[in-house]
Curated annotation (Swiss-Prot):
GO terms for molecular function: DNA binding; double-stranded DNA binding; double-stranded RNA binding; enzyme regulator activity; protein-containing complex binding; RNA binding. Belongs to the C1D family. It holds the Pfam family Sas10_Utp3. InterPro entries: Exosome-assoc_fac/DNA_repair, Sas10/Utp3/C1D. This is Exosome complex protein LRP1. Required for exosome-dependent processing of pre-rRNA and small nucleolar RNA (snRNA) precursors. Involved in processing of 35S pre-rRNA at the A0, A1 and A2 sites. Required for activity of RRP6 in 7S pre-rRNA processing. Also has a role in 3'-processing of U4 and U5 small nuclear RNAs (snRNAs). Acts as a mRNA export factor. Mediates mRNA degradation upon UV irradiation. Maintains genome integrity where it is involved in both non-homologous end joining (NHEJ) and homologous recombination pathway repair of double strand DNA breaks. During NHEJ, required for joining 3'-overhanging ends. Transmembrane segments: none annotated. Coiled coil: none annotated. Associates with nuclear form of the RNA exosome complex. Interacts with RRP4, RRP6, RRP45 and RRP46. Residues 164-184 have a biased composition (Basic residues). It is found in: Nucleus. Residues 157-184 are annotated as: Disordered.
């Protein structure tokens, strides 16, 4: 008796699910598949309807086999796998079409912008790949002017000192050369 009480919620849930499924099945089977296909003009919609039919039939067959306690479910599982692969292929096709449409729309927008820029005379709207700042010179400004002045003064002083020393040296050499020349 305890086992029956444990199963009752599952049976109620299953019964509720069947009640929800019944109107959907009636909607699918109200007209034959051929009649429904004739009403549709779009090939993609026809593919969707056929895939839905195959999935519903395979799923119902699977549920029926489970209820009957059939052990070998491989044929129906193979059929469900095949239907799923068809549904996946349809989804991939939709994704490709969407990407293709987005790409062509982006190309059209780009062409439209280029044509409008040329016609409007905005030829210089596109910037060069190298920034103009790369063609400008760099000017370094010294922060400490006193340091620069003292460095300049030191350089000038040392240059003057070197000149004086070299002129003294050349005068001495001249004197030595005259003395040697005078002894001859």
């Amino acid at each position: 008796m305890e086992d029956i009480e444990k199963i009752k919620p599952y049976v109620r849930s299953f019964s509720k699910a069947l009640d929800e499924l019944k109107p959907e099945i009636e909607k699918l089977t109200s007209k034959s598949l051929d009649e429904q296909l004739l009403l549709l003009s779009d090939e993609r919609a026809k593919l969707e309807l056929i895939n839905r039919y195959a999935y519903v039939l395979s799923s119902l067959m699977f549920a029926n086999m489970k209820v009957l306690g059939v052990k070998d479910m491989s044929p129906i599982l193979g059929e469900l796998k095949r239907v799923k692969s068809y549904m996946d292929k349809a989804k991939q096709y939709d994704n490709r079409i969407t990407k293709s449409n987005e790409k062509s729309q982006a190309e059209q927008e780009k062409a439209k912008n280029i044509i409008s820029n040329v016609l409007d005379g905005n030829k210089n709207q596109f910037e060069p790949s190298i920034s103009r700042s790369n063609f400008q010179g760099k000017h370094t400004k010294f922060e400490n002017d006193e340091l620069a002045e003292s460095t300049t003064t030191k350089i000038i002083d040392s240059t003057d000192h070197i000149r004086k020393a070299s002129s003294k040296k050349s005068k001495r050499l001249d004197k030595v050369g005259k003395k040697k020349g005078g002894k001859k």
